[in-house]
């Protein structure tokens, strides 16, 4: 019997997949627990429409991310911090501080986990920081660390 899974079922498949399962398994386990529906023409049509709308939504999100990435490449933020001899900072600039300054200076809200910083910035000067906007889109912004007077 062909069924469309409504939830992830261990050993059978993931949500939204159409699978061939035994009649007993479908009637006695999947249907009573509302884990699947029988794959008739109406259900198949509904599944195809959902998949199309998901693809359209994903494409739109990707295009918006590419546009935002191009805008963010031109961004330059300044962070002021106390520094000692040789331009070494007292403390360091973390992804959290960069996210806060992006929000404060440019009104762009970025999750600190999306800022890809190998290690915190510990010296004065310019650094290019990579930001992951979308799973397929990353961009770089310039962070200028200046000495606080």
Curated annotation (Swiss-Prot):
Gene Ontology BP annotations: translation
Keyword rRNA-binding: yes
UniProt KW keywords: Ribonucleoprotein, Ribosomal protein, RNA-binding, rRNA-binding
GO molecular function, one term: rRNA binding
Keyword Ribonucleoprotein belongs to the record: yes
Cellular component GO terms held in the UniProt record: ribonucleoprotein complex; ribosome
NCBIfam families noted in UniProt: L9
HAMAP family attached to this UniProt entry: Ribosomal_bL9
Function comment: Binds to the 23S rRNA.
Assigned protein family: Belongs to the bacterial ribosomal protein bL9 family.
Name of the protein this chain belongs to: Large ribosomal subunit protein bL9
The gene coding this protein: rplI
């Amino acid at each position: 019997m062909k069924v469309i899974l409504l939830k992830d079922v261990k050993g059978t498949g993931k949500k939204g997949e159409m699978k061939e399962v035994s009649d007993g398994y479908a009637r006695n386990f999947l249907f009573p627990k509302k884990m699947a529906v029988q794959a008739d023409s109406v259900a198949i049509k509904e599944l195809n429409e959902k998949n199309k709308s998901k693809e359209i939504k994903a494409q739109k999100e990707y295009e918006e991310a590419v546009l935002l990435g191009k805008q963010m490449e031109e961004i330059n933020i300044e962070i002021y911090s106390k520094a000692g001899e040789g331009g070494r900072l007292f403390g360091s600039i973390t992804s959290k501080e960069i996210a806060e300054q992006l929000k404060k200076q440019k009104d762009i809200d970025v999750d600190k986990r999306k800022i890809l910083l190998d290690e915190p910035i510990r010296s004065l000067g310019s650094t290019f920081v990579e930001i992951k906007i979308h799973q397929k889109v990353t961009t770089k912004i310039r962070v200028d660390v200046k000495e606080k007077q």
